[in-house]
């Protein structure tokens, strides 16, 4: 079964919509390089679209009615948006669920040290990375520092044109004979992914003068002392903006497209759909790259607790009503898929691979060898989605992650399926997934948004 290239179907009006969506997407990537920044930007866009913090309804004990738009935030790192439908919540919701964390380097709690005239920040990598990809790149620092007095300082260094950037150094080729004999996963050791941040000594300082200069600069700009690193969350990410890629500008090159490409298109679809019959939900969560753990990951009770609040405000606040709502819901686990790469064709089985420019991808299952750890969607649900996408003239394709036993991966789908709801993975194909700079097709971004709109309206 061959899938058509979406580009060949676009008229001038389609191209205008496509370019507008992708311009907004690039801006979202630039403004959201961490999960906190993504939540902040999502709240801004939601409030502009008329969404109100659910806490306001709870404090005022205000009843929810069809058409109401609310959002809930969990610890500034996860967000759930809802538009109340005309049908009872116990009949289920239509959920788009993506994650907004991405692989990166995290600064350790006691990170700052000086070594032979250089100052470094010690890091611990987050998520699945090829460690050697992170050396000799311009890097930026994003995050927050929480002081003992309760003040929380936002930190972004390396994005403004006048900012310095940072990097992890590498061994010169002339002395790399031994290094290059090592397996790829040990060519650069995790403990060597330390960020070079300074080399100038502070005048009239005898001991650790370079470190002293770094601390002075941090204190001058942010009021940060060395002990404040103990209560900081600082993330090291590639510096620079999302860019159009290719002579034809048909692709996007950017950091964090896994999974912010699906997060953004889910958010846009959520804000676009009006007056749904079934309640709509857009769920953007944290910690997927390390197992969806913690209070802001999908395994927490944030979503379930928020649904309980909605039901209570809608006059259906019983445990049984919550269970019925969850079990009757349908979900697209909006997560990316591996795009077929001709340079690494041996890793893919072409009949069941995702291709650039052919639309959103449906992954009936993910997992590893033998489908281990997978959510395997039901055939009936796949059939229903086929009808929804075809009726909405969405370009879509099906795929597995790669050849059997070559590798594997997982998403939040299996977690949500524990409620008994129908769940399937559905997202955008990505080249160079988990690299510092990933690639997507503008056409697939556009088709994903179309698919998510169709799902919210008709699932």
Task: Explain the meaning of each model-derived region.
Residues 1-459:
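N-terminal hydrophobic/helix-forming segments and targeting peptides
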């Amino acid at each position: 079964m061959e899938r058509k290239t979406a580009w060949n179907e676009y008229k001038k009006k389609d191209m205008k919509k496509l370019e507008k969506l992708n311009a907004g997407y690039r801006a979202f990537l630039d403004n959201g390089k961490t999960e906190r920044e993504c939540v902040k930007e999502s709240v801004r866009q939601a409030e502009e679209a008329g969404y109100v913090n659910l806490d306001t309804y709870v404090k005022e004990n205000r009843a929810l009615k069809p058409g109401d738009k609310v959002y809930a935030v969990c610890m500034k790192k996860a967000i759930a948006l809802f538009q109340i439908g005309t049908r009872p919540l116990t009949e289920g919701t239509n959920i788009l669920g993506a994650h907004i964390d991405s692989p990166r380097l995290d600064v350790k709690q006691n990170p700052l040290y000086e070594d032979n005239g250089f100052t470094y920040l010690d890091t611990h990598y987050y998520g699945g990375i090829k460690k050697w990809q992170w050396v000799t790149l311009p890097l930026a620092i994003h995050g927050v520092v929480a002081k003992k007095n309760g003040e929380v300082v936002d930190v972004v260094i390396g994005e403004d044109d006048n900012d310095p950037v940072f990097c992890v150094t590498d061994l010169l080729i002339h002395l790399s004979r031994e290094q290059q004999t090592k397996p790829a996963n040990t060519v650069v050791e995790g403990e060597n992914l330390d960020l070079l941040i300074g080399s100038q000594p502070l005048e009239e300082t005898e001991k650790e003068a370079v470190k002293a200069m770094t601390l002075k600069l941090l204190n001058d700009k942010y009021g940060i002392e060395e002990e404040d690193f103990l209560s900081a969350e600082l993330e090291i990410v590639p510096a620079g903006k999302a860019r159009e890629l290719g002579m034809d500008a048909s692709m996007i090159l950017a950091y964090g497209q896994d999974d912010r490409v699906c997060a953004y298109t889910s958010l846009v679809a959520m804000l676009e759909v009006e007056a749904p019959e079934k309640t709509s939900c857009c769920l953007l969560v944290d910690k997927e790259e390390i197992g969806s753990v913690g209070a802001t990951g999908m395994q927490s009770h944030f979503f379930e607790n928020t649904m309980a609040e909605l039901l209570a405000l809608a006059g259906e606040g019983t445990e049984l009503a919550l269970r019925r709502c969850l079990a009757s819901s349908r979900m697209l686990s909006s997560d990316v898929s591996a795009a077929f790469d001709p340079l690494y064709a041996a890793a893919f089985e072409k009949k069941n691979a995702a291709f650039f420019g052919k639309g959103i991808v449906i992954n009936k299952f993910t997992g590893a060898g033998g489908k281990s750890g997978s959510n395997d969607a039901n055939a009936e649900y796949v059939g229903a989605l086929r009808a929804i996408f075809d009726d909405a003239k969405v370009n879509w394709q099906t795929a597995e992650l790669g050849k059997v036993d070559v590798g594997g991966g997982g998403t939040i789908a299996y977690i949500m399926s524990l409620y008994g709801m129908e769940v399937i993975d559905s997202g955008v194909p990505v080249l160079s997934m988990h690299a510092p700079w990933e690639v997507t097709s503008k056409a697939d971004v556009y088709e994903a948004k179309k698919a998510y709109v169709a799902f919210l309206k008709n699932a």
